[in-house]
A protein has these predicted regions:
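N-terminal pre-catalytic "stem/leader" segment of glycosyltransferase-like enzymes
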Residues: 221-285
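Conserved N-terminal segment of class I S-adenosyl-L-methionine
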Residues: 1-84, 88, 102-105, 175-195, ...
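Conserved acidic donor-binding segment of nucleotide-sugar-dependent glycosyltransferases
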Residues: 484-495, 503-508
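A charged, aromatic-enriched C-terminal amphipathic alpha-helix characteristic of glycosyltransferases
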Residues: 360, 509-547
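Nucleotide-sugar-dependent
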Residues: 314-315, 383, 430-436, 441-466, ...
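S-adenosyl-L-methionine-dependent methyltransferase catalytic module, highlighting the catalytic core
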Residues: 4-5, 9-10, 35, 77, ...
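Donor nucleotide-sugar binding/catalytic pocket of nucleotide-sugar-dependent glycosyltransferases
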Residues: 70-71, 175, 330-362
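Conserved catalytic-core segment of nucleotide-activated headgroup transferases in glycan assembly
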Residues: 232-254, 359-360, 368-439
Length: 569
């Protein structure tokens, strides 16, 4: 007989992203074994995490993940938390276990800061499985789940909305958790005649009965609203995740912000009545139809931002089209100060958001002191690594099975490695890329000294360091980030590379020391939690200055003020 996992050992994946990523103080009521605290530490280790848990054994298990944990019954008394001090108050599967959840909501709402948010996950008493079991005569309590024998209270969507309002809060949004879509479809199909006989519209009933739970967000005052829609490139090498998906998810963790990512270059349907921003990911805007496209985007009323994180000289058509890619938008966002200086030639409104990670993973390397694996997984780096291959092969010959190599995407480099201790994987998803990297101890990051490379960011170092890899890198780009001998090694020539690699093989503890230092640096300064507020502040400032920015746009490109002939797609 297997022992069931401790209550609360896993974080609710639908609740976690609805907590503001840059929250400074969070109270987790009924934290159980601390799953939410553990997961949150990987997203924002700088948050002050406070928990309430009445069960002594669970509290002891959760304690390492929180700054404070109070062993008390939330219905018997409030935790020692100052009124107005919390950015987030979390009830994850807790309210249904309380005798008087309405009183608890009223009592704890005062702990929220003026812009703080209550996040709660509650079961839906209208879930179709309730009706199904009652109709079939099989309703009984269970140890866990919707029919948990410790559930004392039940909520409908309308009932929970009323409870939040009566607690003095403003319901902001609610997300349904649907775990068995085929089940509700089959159930509604079977009982549709009865529903219709009762005057209940089957589709409406299905919407109410499908969610197993609801995740609610409510605030003390109505938040300012903002809609951000991004039009993206075809996913390649994780750039979409790092530059678009994860930053927008960070924005959407704030109440009142709606974020959506759509592939391609069509005209997005912006939510009505909400100030909007359209982000174009690296669109060249060189086609003859580009002015019409930009006019159609402008006609939505949204502010237009170009997201560009590479040297535009790599695409000559940008210059040939008069740099419309940057002149024809309200603002530009990029990843490095060098790129900002370049884009300022064509647009005075440029912001830098360094590449950062949404979460820092738990390390799973350095498990064998007798073997190290070198990771090489960047795109279009064949010319950068080629001069180093003879030196790498020499070290591989000396090291034997003590050194393996993991190569992603670059088949030519893989084939040139003279060792049986090598693995190859084609270009896959960003998750697959990270999984391959996570099993290695050393990352090799070569970059030739070219204009295009000098404009690149240090993302590969950030990703590798987060997984606790020791980086050996070129001075181009990485010399400004890596402290040689402290957070990695900087090498310029093949013989320097071979010397550094031999030293790490001789003393793996040194590789681990530098990898740990690099990981600590990423945790301190290169997580999205550190820049979420700055990005949102810039976006809101653009909205406030839209008239001014729009006038500047039309002064740069007067043709964008003409009537559009573009057909929205």
């Amino acid at each position: 007989m297997t022992t069931p996992p401790a209550y609360g050992i896993r974080a609710n994946p639908d609740l976690l992203p609805r907590i503001p990523l840059d929250a400074r103080a969070i109270l987790d009521v009924g934290c159980g074994a601390g799953g939410l605290g553990a997961a949150w530490r990987r997203r924002n280790p700088h948050t002050r995490l406070i928990a309430v848990e009445p069960d002594a054994a669970l509290a002891a298990e959760a304690e390492p993940h929180y700054d404070e944990i109070h062993r008390l019954d939330i219905e018997a008394g409030s935790p020692p938390v100052a009124e107005g001090s919390l950015d987030a108050l979390v009830f994850g599967d807790v309210l249904e276990h309380l005798r008087d959840p309405w009183a608890v909501l009223r009592g704890t709402a005062r702990l929220l800061a003026p812009d703080g948010v209550l996040v709660a996950c509650v079961p839906n008493v209208e879930h179709w499985s309730f009706a199904a079991r009652l109709l079939m005569g099989g309703w009984r309590y269970e140890e866990t789940g919707l029919f948990d024998r410790t559930h004392l209270r039940w909520f409908t969507r309308d009932g929970m909305h009323q409870a939040l309002v009566e607690a003095g809060l403003v319901p902001v949004d609610v997300a349904p958790r649907i775990v068995d879509a085929p089940g509700i479809e089959d159930f509604v199909r079977r009982i549709s005649p009865a529903l219709q006989a009762l005057g209940v519209e089957p589709a409406g009933y299905a919407r109410r009965a499908a969610p197993l739970q609801y995740v609610w967000r409510a605030t003390r005052r109505r938040p300012a609203r903002l809609a951000v829609v991004a039009r993206t490139l075809r996913p390649v090498g994780g750039i979409n995740e790092v530059r678009i998906h994860e930053p927008l998810a960070a924005l959407a963790s704030r109440p009142g912000v709606v974020a959506r990512v759509e592939p391609g270059a069509g005209i997005p349907q912006m939510p009505p009545g909400i100030p909007g921003i359209i982000v174009l990911q690296r669109q060249l805007l060189n086609a003859p139809s580009a002015p019409d496209y930009l006019r159609a985007l402008r006609a939505t009323g949204a502010l237009i931002i170009q997201e560009f994180d590479d040297d535009p000289a790599h695409w000559p058509v940008i210059e040939e089209s008069g740099h419309l890619a940057f002149r024809g938008v309200h603002a530009v966002q990029t990843s490095t100060p060098a790129l900002r200086e370049l884009f300022l030639r064509w647009n005075p409104e440029v912001a830098v958001f360094p590449n950062a990670l949404a979460t820092v993973p738990e390390p799973r390397n350095f498990t064998s002191p007798d073997r190290l694996t070198l990771f090489f997984g960047a795109l279009n780096r064949e010319g950068d690594i080629a001069p180093f291959l003879p030196a790498l092969n020499a070290v591989l010959a000396e090291a034997g099975e003590r050194l393996a190599v993991q190569v992603l995407h670059d088949r030519a480099t893989f084939d040139a490695l003279e060792t049986p201790h090598k693995r190859f994987a084609p270009l896959g998803s960003y998750a697959e890329y990270q999984a391959a990297m996570a099993g290695c101890e050393i990352a090799f990051l070569p970059l030739r000294d070219t204009r295009f490379n000098r404009m690149k960011s240090d993302l590969k170092f950030v990703e590798a360091a987060a997984h606790r890899l020791c980086c050996i890198a070129s001075p181009v780009v990485y010399g400004a980030t890596i402290r040689d001998g402290e957070t990695g090694r900087i090498v310029q020539a093949p013989d320097e590379f071979a010397h550094a690699l031999r030293a790490l093989l001789a003393t793996p503890a040194e590789a681990l020391r530098m990898a740990e230092a690099a990981r600590a640096e990423v945790i301190a300064s290169r997580l999205l939690a550190r820049q979420a507020a700055a990005r949102l502040s810039w976006y809101r400032s653009l909205i406030e200055r839209r008239a001014e920015l729009d006038a500047a746009l039309l002064a740069r490109v007067p043709v964008l003020g003409a009537a559009t002939t573009h057909t929205p797609r």
